[in-house]
Structures are given as C-alpha cells and as structure tokens.
Amino acid sequence: MARTKQTARKSTGGKAPRKQLASKAARKAAPATGGVKKPHRYRPGTVALREIRRYQKSTELLIRKLPFQRLVREIAQDFKTDLRFQSSAIGALQEAVEAYLVSLFEDTNLCAIHGKRVTIQPKDMQLARRLRGERS
C-alpha cells in the first residue's frame, strides 16, 4: 500500500491511548521466576502473637538490669543522698516492678476489650488503675 500524506485534523476531545512506560513493558515481558524474589512477610498480627506466647512462657527479666539500677538510684536520691543498695535489693525491686507492670497491662487489655477494641489506649490504663484504687 502506498504511503499518503497526513493532514491535520481537529481533535474530537477524546483521550489518546497512553504509551506504556519502558519499565512496565519490560516487567510484563520478563518471566515471573527470573526476577528477584521478594522477602517472606507474615500476616499482620502473626509475629505479635508469637512474641506474646514467647514472653508468657519465659521467666527472665525484660527490663535491662543497668538502666533499671540507674533509675532506682536516681529516684532514691530525691529522698536521701548517698544511699547504697545491695544487688539483691535491686533484683527484688526489679522483680516486683515487672510483676506489677505485667499485671497492669493485663488489666489494661481487659479494659480495651471491654471497650470493644483490641488496641490499648491511655484511658484503658487510667481506668485499670482507678478500678484498682491506685488513683482517684
């Protein structure tokens, strides 16, 4: 067929079909197995549940010892300067603090569930402490 000269025509207002980008075309043309394998991801919540089970099974302390010791010494200085602590006293304090926090978070979670939520919020912790009689 012979080539003919094109003449300019008035546009009818319709959109012209867009050309695909080179990268998109290359991606479609490339075989699925030849590309880079993306890393495996667990569904949201799976890892959180695994961590919950792991920490419920364990008995080790979760707060690091030295930062906790520094905090205890800093708080104790407000009451009396030059206080000394036995290491067993710091250990007993840490055990008690962690037991209290775990119990508080359990009650906080129950308050969130009571509010038909799965995410704990500050108001849940305030309610838990209020019900315990710790704070008016």
Swiss-Prot record:
GO cellular component: heterochromatin; mating-type region heterochromatin; nucleolar peripheral inclusion body; nucleosome; nucleus; pericentric heterochromatin; subtelomeric heterochromatin
List of residues that carry N6-methyllysine: K5, K10, K19, K24, K28, K37, K80
Main subcellular localisation: nucleus
UniProt GO molecular function: chromatin-protein adaptor activity; DNA binding; protein heterodimerization activity; structural constituent of chromatin
InterPro entries listed in its UniProt record: Histone-fold, Histone_H2A/H2B/H3, Histone_H3/CENP-A
SUPFAM superfamilies per the UniProt record, alphabetical: Histone-fold (SSF47113)
Feature: compositional bias, Low complexity: 19-32
Post-translational modification Phosphoserine, affected residues: S11
CDD domains from the UniProt entry: HFD_H3 (cd22911)
SMART domains: H3
Residues found modified as N6,N6-dimethyllysine: K5, K15, K28, K37, K80
Post-translational modification: Phosphorylated by ark1 to form H3S10ph in a cell cycle-dependent manner during mitosis and meiosis. H3S10ph is also formed by ssp2, promotes subsequent H3K14ac formation by gcn5, and is required for transcriptional activation through TBP recruitment to the promoters. Dephosphorylation is performed by sds21. Mono-, di- and trimethylated by the COMPASS complex to form H3K4me1/2/3. H3K4me activates gene expression by regulating transcription elongation and plays a role in telomere length maintenance. H3K4me enrichment correlates with transcription levels, and occurs in a 5' to 3' gradient with H3K4me3 enrichment at the 5'-end of genes, shifting to H3K4me2 and then H3K4me1. Methylated by clr4 to form H3K9me1. H3K9me1 represents a specific tag for epigenetic transcriptional repression by recruiting swi6/HP1 to methylated histones. Targeting to histone probably involves clr3 and rik1.
One GO term (biological process): DNA damage response
UniProt modified residues of type N6,N6,N6-trimethyllysine: K5, K28, K37, K80
Keyword Nucleus annotated: yes
Family: Belongs to the histone H3 family.
Assembly behavior: The nucleosome is a histone octamer containing two molecules each of H2A, H2B, H3 and H4 assembled in one H3-H4 heterotetramer and two H2A-H2B heterodimers. The octamer wraps approximately 147 bp of DNA.
Protein name: Histone H3.1/H3.2
Protein source organism: Schizosaccharomyces pombe (strain 972 / ATCC 24843) (Fission yeast)
